[in-house]
A protein has these predicted regions:
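Conserved core of the PLP fold type I
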Residues: 32, 37-178, 183, 189-204, ...
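Short, flexible coil/turn micro-motifs enriched in small/turn-prone residues
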Residues: 4-6, 41, 155, 218, ...
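Active-site donor-binding loop signature of nucleotide-sugar glycosyltransferases
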Residues: 10, 122, 215
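Short glycine-rich anion-binding loops that position phosphate/pyrophosphate groups of nucleotides
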Residues: 11-14, 153-156, 218
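Conserved core segment of the aminotransferase class I/II
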Residues: 23, 206-229
Length: 229
């Protein structure tokens, strides 16, 4: 059997980069300082301190102030994928626009909910706006507009494509025209090294129909299951 040195199929982090000592120290500090709080339920949105930290994280990255009360902690990004799909679904068989090549876990979640998935062709800039517009127009005429558009716009899985700002703005305008929410899964944005990072969809427009998913799995550890909406 061939030995695989680097597995690009699963999005695993390198165990050697796991900050064991730092997390041990942080866990000890939390137990010492917040022992009583740890014995209580954190509320429906999740731990307030963690939500505030993630809000600061997004503000530092996107330059947009985020109200921590608009953040929901999730069990990794995939729970966010499932929760948003469940929340936006009205009936089995509802339509969703997805990228033609899409992360298998997302496809599996949507299949389990009986979504009718319409694939949008990709090129080096991600979802093709012409195809998005064409499908929105067609589905509008058929009176079955998609419940949302799902995209991994930064380091798309499996292609690795990054959608430029101009294209993001185009898709935002199309979605607003038809009243269709955008669900952006930004779980790979932290795997970025050189040059400016393209802005998230929500940072380009204050449309409340935009839903943003993010995760710490790719920069910390998938097993910790830390994500947020």
């Amino acid at each position: 059997m061939t030995q695989i040195k680097y597995d690009f199929g699963s999005g695993r982090s390198d165990p050697a980069t796991f900050p064991v000592a730092a997390l041990q120290a942080a866990a000890t500090q939390v137990i010492e300082e917040q022992a009583e709080a740890l014995t209580q339920y954190p509320g429906d949105l999740g731990h307030a301190g963690m939500r505030a930290a993630m809000a600061r994280r997004e503000e530092d990255r996107e330059g947009i102030r985020i109200d921590p009360n608009h953040l929901l902690l999730t069990n990794g990004s995939m729970q966010g994928v499932t929760l948003t799909a469940e929340a936006l679904q009205e009936n089995r068989g509802d339509t969703v626009l997805v990228e033609e090549y899409c992360y298998p876990g997302t496809l599996s979640a949507y299949r389990s909910l009986k979504y009718d998935m319409v694939g949008i062709p990709l090129n080096e800039g991600g979802m093709c706006p012409d195809a998005v517009e064409r499908e929105l127009y067609r589905l509008h005429k058929e009176k079955r507009l998609p419940k949302f558009i799902y995209t991994i716009s930064t380091y798309q899985n499996p292609t690795g494509f990054v959608m430029p700002k101009t294209r993001r703005l185009q898709i935002i305008e199309m979605a607003k025209h038809y009243g269709v929410p955008i669900v952006e899964d930004n779980c790979y944005a932290d795997v970025h090294y050189d040059g400016p990072l393209e802005p998230a969809f929500y940072a380009l427009d204050n449309d409340p129909n935009q839903i943003y998913l993010c995760s710490l799995s790719k920069i910390l550890a998938p097993g910790l299951r830390l994500g947020y909406i």
